[in-house]
Amino acid sequence: MITLTGHTLTVEEMKRLLLEGEGVTACPNSMQKVAECREVVEKIVEDGKVVYGITTGFGKFSDVLIQKEDVKALQHNLIQSHACGIGDPFPEEVSRGMLILRANTMLKGVSGVRPLVVNMLLEFVNRKIHPVVPQQGSLGASGDLAPLSHLALVLLGEGEVFYKGKRAHAMVALTEEGLEPIELEAKEGLALINGTQAMTAQGVLSYIEAEATAYQAELIASMTIEGLQGIIDAFDENVHKARGYKEQVEVASRIRDILHDSKLTTKQGELRVQDAYSLRCIPQVHGASWQVLNYVKEKLEIEMNAATDNPLIFDGGEKVISGGNFHGQPIAFAMDFLKVGMAELANISERRIERLVNPQLNDLPPFLSPEPGLQSGAMIMQYAAASLVSENKTLAHPASVDSIPSSANQEDHVSMGTIASRHAHQIIQNVRRVLSIEMICAMQAAEYRGIENMSTVTKSFYHQGRQQVPSITNDRIFSTDIENITHWLKTNYSIKERLDVNAAL
């Protein structure tokens, strides 16, 4: 059970919450702050003060005063009218993440909701009732209005949820769990939907997958080094310390550890003086991607614990301030950066695939074919990898450089952060497929070199991979092999836990 405080949530805790189904509870001190802040909102309504989002309309309607008797209707109308999401739903892990992050930001005690609202969000998390939230429709400012409106709907007993492995109407799940839908009061609708929790939840899942995929890329690249009898000197510690990037040093160190007892690596000048960049520069390229990952993790953990709605309430109600913390620009930039960093892992992987299958670049059978000419072997696998990396180049175009004014130009600059976050996740799926192709080719190359000559780590990884796909002895439908390895990497070596090189032993 993980305790939410509004200040201390980490990516590692989110991994347990999203992927292992761990439950959540609220810190009592934080809940006390929620209750105290709520008293301020109720006094504002009672006194008839003009405060944006509490006693006024929204966006361009911020100058329209709302009467006390209409305050509840205002919040309900807000949720229904803003539930304009379209397209396929977010993965269930992402909608679960939205619930968690929304509760966490409310626990900072500056949003003005009742403790009841926070408790309802936590009930949904712990009972695994996850809102069906369409992926498209957010501008990333004022936050993720459309996606979070679909989240808010289910608290009211409206909309759809993922429940016990099926899609169902929210009331079906509420009834079965013995829960009553809530009726929103002043500010609560706005507090639920005005924030960055859709882009951030998707970003967290993307980061978790990206981190594990980056470790996998090192292990698979190590198999390719063996298959091509790569020069191990290029990974010498002195080379990488001379440049000074810690991530580069760490990648080189891990690859040395993976290959320390391999009989397939060579020394400088033994077969050739130096390798092509796609082998020699693995620490430099992969290390740079780790720099991106470290940056992204830092920004995500700030945003996961940020107050991102509007207005915010401070000093016991002395200050009720309209600001712009809902603007998703920090996460938009981070997700665009993640897209580029991960796409590059696929780019260099595809070049290693080419070196494995091109007979002009190695002494292996052409296209790793068991009978070149009659059988094409891995020829079209390289085509598939090339297609995926080219698709990634399109997806890697920054979403954050775009902005379209909305709400009659009141909201005249937006982040498009949710688009960036969604595209980052798509890129990661493509990267995993490219790495799967590299692994299939590297395993085949290892067989020509002699499995007994592989390192202890890569040999273990090879045998586990061969449990997923057989050796290429004849042409067959290779798309099945690619998807099998891709699924295996995701479910066994990916987002369940951080990949340690010794995990393959």
UniProtKB/Swiss-Prot annotation:
Record has Cytoplasm as a keyword: yes
Subcellular location: Cytoplasm
Class in the EC hierarchy, top level: lyase
Disulfide bonds: none
Modifications made to the protein after synthesis: Contains an active site 4-methylidene-imidazol-5-one (MIO), which is formed autocatalytically by cyclization and dehydration of residues Ala-Ser-Gly.
Known pathway: Amino-acid degradation; L-histidine degradation into L-glutamate; N-formimidoyl-L-glutamate from L-histidine: step 1/3
Cross-link 5-imidazolinone (Ala-Gly): residue positions: 141-143
GO CC, alphabetical: cytoplasm
Entry-linked Gene3D superfamilies: Fumarase/aspartase (Central domain), Fumarase/aspartase (N-terminal domain)
CDD domains hit by this protein: PAL-HAL
Listed InterPro entries: Aromatic_Lyase, Fumarase/histidase_N, HutH, L-Aspartase-like, Phe/His_NH3-lyase_AS
Alphabetical UniProt keywords: Cytoplasm, Histidine metabolism, Lyase
Statement: the UniProt record of this protein carries the keyword Ribosomal protein: no
Main location: cytoplasm
GO terms classed as biological process: L-histidine catabolic process to glutamate and formamide; L-histidine catabolic process to glutamate and formate
EC number of this enzyme: 4.3.1.3
Modification sites for 2,3-didehydroalanine (Ser): 142
Gene Ontology molecular function: histidine ammonia-lyase activity
Reactions listed under catalytic activity: L-histidine = trans-urocanate + NH4(+)
Family from the record: Belongs to the PAL/histidase family.
Protein name: Histidine ammonia-lyase
Gene: hutH
